[in-house]
Amino acid sequence: MNPSTTQARVVVDELIRGGVRDVVLCPGSRNAPLAFALQDADHAGRIRLHVRIDERTAGYLAIGLAVAAGAPVCVAMTSGTAVANLGPAVVEANYARVPLIVLSANRPYELLGTGANQTMEQLGYFGTQVRAAISLGLAEDAPERLDSLNATWRSATCRVLVAATGSRTANAGPVQFDIPLREPLIPDPEPHGAITPQGRPGGKPWTYIPQVTFDQPLEIDLSADTVVIAGHGAGVHPNLTELPIVAEPTAPFGPYRPYPLHPLALPLLHPKQVIMLGRPTLHRPVSALLADPQVPVYALTTGPCWPDVSGNSQAAGTRAVTTGTPHPAWLQRCAEMNQHAISTVRSQLAAHPLITGLHVAAAVADALRPGDQLVLGASNPVRDMALVGLSTDGIQVRSNRGVAGIDGTVSTAIGAALAYERSPGYAGSTDRPARTVALIGDLAFVHDSSGLLIGPTEPTPQQLKIVVSNDNGGGIFELLEQGDPRLSAVSSRIFGTPHDVDVGALCRAYHVEGRQIEVDKLREALDEPGVGMRVLEVKADRSSLRQLHAAITATL
């Protein structure tokens, strides 16, 4: 067995021992030893391998897999620009704290600077965006030292896993594992009895690291009029569920929220203090409240850092030790304002003469059922879902909120669906299987349309429906400063970016079923039986979005 093959097999074995169950592989020559080792592990049923030709979409596929499975996922690629194409996914994984492992095959380091083909300084390429950048070093052709080399390779792999999962830091995130490989890059004809150097007995990792306990209790008196703002990455806090909670769709508060609070109700209330969970990013009324110097803010997070955009946080910890109880009059007032806000949004939707992205979001929200997984685009869709009063009871909601880019949304949804469909708690049944429903805008869909490319031999979601709210451009800019009517002569082109893409034709090019439907037929289409991946396009208007949102605000 040649050194590169031996090293690759050891690394793959140790990754599996450390909890890796899904790996995304992009084809190349230099990463061939890893590719052969991964294929062997897939054939043996130890991992599930996903082959993709585009490293950018592969990275987001891995993010979807990792988020939905709650486990580290690897992406393996060859050297050069293949590594650079992981940049967007690495940045998202950094800020969303996703355990993404970049297995970057490299040329031998002595070739750097020589002009060798497909060679660049890729170790450390991701800079501060990764938790660690670890090099394994070239495998030596030294059979007499194989036991020592085996220990070195396995120990390094464990360090990669610990950094990615945050076992010692409570701060999961991406890691680059750079592995220079020398020819030969394919397995030798092996003599009978050739074996890979073994790991610890019983399938245990080479170096066991228990999960760190990160606990910083914070005493908070709930007798003051309090609201909870739960953003992306919020932990579950059972002792706070009796408070009014403004929960972003990805916050895990569906079944634990007897007092939901609509974000548009906040300006109608005057809370005396705020408990902030996770990292809220969606709503301007929330940002305004968190920035109010007269309102104390207590930040509770699941890791060592806490968000504080306005610099207004009074204290930070990981859990609340509560004293006092909320006043019934305050809870009643919040409940009334919540219902008023939801009713206002829905009544204005009914009165509006055109179909907008908000209408599409409302139709999707009303069609969901317990056991579903919902993946939301990072621009208007995730905000629209919060505004139409989505109930997340029994629903898993995902969205790329790390840096909130629209790139990779299709691939993220596919990865999330693949992970969800084989999760232990998957609620599917033969008569009514649980689904993954993705709601994304047309720009996000077109931007990541290559994510639809799944080879005929690759794992494919069996219950994924992608709803494309197509308003032919960037609808979110209609609601920002750039959407000011006085700028309309130029803003449509440079911000709205109309594209006129035929979504159905794009789907057909990738052999994906897709069709255009009316918004009032969306529930029926989502409930249609069948397996596989489908795209449902709903035409929407963005020219009246500013008017619709203004009408909602005025009615409130």
Curated annotation (Swiss-Prot):
Gene3D superfamilies: 3.40.50.970, TPP-binding domain (3.40.50.1220). GO terms for molecular function: 2-succinyl-5-enolpyruvyl-6-hydroxy-3-cyclohexene-1-carboxylic-acid synthase activity; magnesium ion binding; manganese ion binding; thiamine pyrophosphate binding. One of its GO terms (biological process) is menaquinone biosynthetic process. This is 2-succinyl-5-enolpyruvyl-6-hydroxy-3-cyclohexene-1-carboxylate synthase. It is an enzyme of class 2 (transferase). Its EC number is 2.2.1.9. Homodimer. It comes from the Bacteria. The gene is menD. Binds 1 thiamine pyrophosphate per subunit. InterPro entries: MenaQ_synth_MenD, THDP-binding, Thiamin_PyroP_enz_TPP-bd_dom. Belongs to the TPP enzyme family. MenD subfamily. Keywords: Magnesium, Manganese, Menaquinone biosynthesis, Metal-binding, Thiamine pyrophosphate, Transferase. Its cofactor is Mg(2+); Mn(2+); thiamine diphosphate. Pathway: Quinol/quinone metabolism; 1,4-dihydroxy-2-naphthoate biosynthesis; 1,4-dihydroxy-2-naphthoate from chorismate: step 2/7; Quinol/quinone metabolism; menaquinone biosynthesis. Catalyzes the thiamine diphosphate-dependent decarboxylation of 2-oxoglutarate and the subsequent addition of the resulting succinic semialdehyde-thiamine pyrophosphate anion to isochorismate to yield 2-succinyl-5-enolpyruvyl-6-hydroxy-3-cyclohexene-1-carboxylate (SEPHCHC). CDD domains: TPP_PYR_MenD, TPP_SHCHC_synthase.
